[in-house]
Amino acid sequence: MDIKTFAKEHFEEYQALICKLTSIPAPSHHEERRAAFICEYLHQLGYGQAFIDDAKNVICEIKGSDLEAPVHIFMAHTDTVFPDETEIPVIVEDGCIKASGVGDDTTNVCAILMTLKYLSEKQIVPKQTMVFALNSFEEGLGNLKGCRALV
């Protein structure tokens, strides 16, 4: 199955994942619950090597078959700009997900998670080593702390 077919067949799962992750509050400096959910999700996919670093980034590295090839890094941030930690209502209407933070950047986090699901299910070993980083502290006073911790 190619990735386009996979995406079509798993679209409802992708939407449900977006709704679930969006409902977990994650203001900068308080991403612990969202990071824990993501890391556990990756472990359930078979990525036991996924971990949360000291900067609250969730990191999952997949070794490539050619260790001399350049490493590719894919990132999306887990925090939201909203300062409080109250539950965020999520509304699905006419196939559209409406919620604070869903487009910045929760949908992209979920796209990375679904990509990792595809790679796991298809047992794909990439040529290049791939690092998937769901980084923290991107918004506002977070000042890209998660990104800077990665480099």
Predicted regions span which residues?
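Acidic/His- and Gly-rich active-site-bordering loop/insert found
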Residues: 2-98
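Loop-rich non-cytosolic ectodomains and luminal regions
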Residues: 100-103
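Acidic/histidine-rich catalytic neighborhood of metal-dependent amide-processing enzymes
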Residues: 105-151
